[in-house]
Design a protein with these regions (language model features):
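Bacterial signal peptide processing site
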Residues: 19-21
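Short, low-complexity, Pro/Ser/Thr/Gly-rich segments in the mature regions of secreted, periplasmic
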Residues: 218-237
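A short, surface-exposed beta-strand/turn
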Residues: 116-119, 201-221
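Extended, low-hydrophobicity segments enriched in charged/polar residues
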Residues: 24-169
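Short, cysteine-centered beta-strand-loop-beta hairpins and adjacent loop/turn segments enriched
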Residues: 193-205, 227-229
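Positively charged n-region of N-terminal signal peptides that target proteins for export
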Residues: 1-4
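Generic short beta-strand segments
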Residues: 184-196
C-alpha cells in the first residue's frame, strides 16, 4: 500500500512538472482590440495623385525637394482631428545626397523621407516637420487621436492578434500588443518599430510614444519584442 502511494505521488509530481514546463506565464501575449478607424482617400484618388505627381499644384513642383511619389496613408490615421484629406508625399535619397526635410524618415542604404499632403481650408499643404503636424492636429483629445498622431509622426506600426501568427518568435516577456491610454495628463501609445534593414534575423522593437495634449511627443528606449522567423534569411539594402 505504502509503495503504491509513493508511486502515485511520483506520477502526480511528474504530471505537474510537465504541465508547468508547458505553461510559461512569461511568454504570454497581452492582447488588445484594434480600433475601428478608416481614412477617406477620395480627395487624392479623384485627382489621380496615386498614379502621378502631376496632380500637384505647380508651386509644389518648383520648390526644393519636389515630391517624387504619393501614397495612401494607413487607416490607423483615421483618428486624426480635424478630419482632413491626407496622403504621404515620399522622397527617396541615397547616402551621398542631401537629406529631405521630413516628418520622419526610414534610413538604410537609401533614405525614405515622409512628408504629408494635407488639405486645410481648401488649400493643399506640404507638411515636412513635426511642428507642422502639431500646428494642424493639436490639441490631442482622445486615445484614438493619440494613436493616429503617434503613428503619423513616427512611422511605427500597430500590432494586434499576434498570437495567431505562428511565425513570430516571442522575445519580450510578456509581449503586449498595441494600446493607447490616457492617465489624465498624457497619452501613452504602445507601438512597434518593424522597419527592415540589412540582413536577418530582423528584430521588431516595441516603443512607447508619449503624446501630450498639446501635441508634443517623446519616445521610450526600444525593447526587443519579437522576430518573424520567415524573414531570418532576408537581406535588405
Amino acid at each position: 500500500m505504502k509503495r503504491n502511494l509513493i508511486l502515485l505521488g511520483f506520477l502526480v509530481a511528474l504530471l505537474i512538472s510537465c504541465r508547468l514546463t508547458q505553461f510559461n506565464p512569461f511568454r504570454r501575449v497581452i492582447e488588445h482590440s484594434a480600433p475601428e478607424l478608416t481614412v477617406d482617400n477620395a480627395y487624392f484618388k479623384d485627382l489621380g495623385c496615386f498614379q502621378s505627381v502631376d496632380c500637384l499644384p505647380e508651386e509644389f513642383t518648383n520648390r526644393p525637394y519636389p515630391v517624387q511619389s504619393i501614397y495612401q496613408v494607413s487607416d490607423l490615421l483615421g483618428g486624426l482631428r480635424p478630419e482632413l484629406p491626407i496622403a504621404i508625399a515620399g522622397n527617396v535619397t541615397f547616402y551621398d545626397e542631401e537629406k529631405v526635410p521630413s516628418v520622419y524618415s526610414q534610413n538604410c542604404m537609401a533614405s525614405f523621407a515622409v512628408r504629408y499632403l494635407i488639405v486645410v481650408d481648401g488649400q493643399m499643404r506640404l507638411v515636412d516637420s513635426y511642428e507642422g503636424m502639431r500646428e494642424i492636429y493639436a490639441p490631442i483629445e482622445n486615445e484614438d487621436e493619440a494613436l493616429s498622431y503617434a503613428v503619423a509622426l513616427t512611422g511605427y506600426s500597430a500590432y494586434y492578434d499576434i498570437k495567431s501568427n505562428s511565425d513570430y518568435k516571442i522575445l519580450a516577456k510578456p509581449l503586449e500588443e498595441t494600446y493607447s491610454r490616457f492617465d489624465g495628463e498624457v497619452f501613452t501609445v504602445h507601438l512597434f518599430n518593424d522597419f527592415l534593414c540589412g540582413c536577418g534575423p530582423h528584430i521588431t522593437e516595441s516603443v512607447d510614444v508619449t503624446v501630450t495634449q498639446d501635441g508634443e511627443i517623446s519616445l521610450s528606449e526600444p525593447v526587443d519584442t519579437f522576430r518573424d522567423v520567415t524573414m531570418d534569411d532576408l537581406c535588405i539594402d
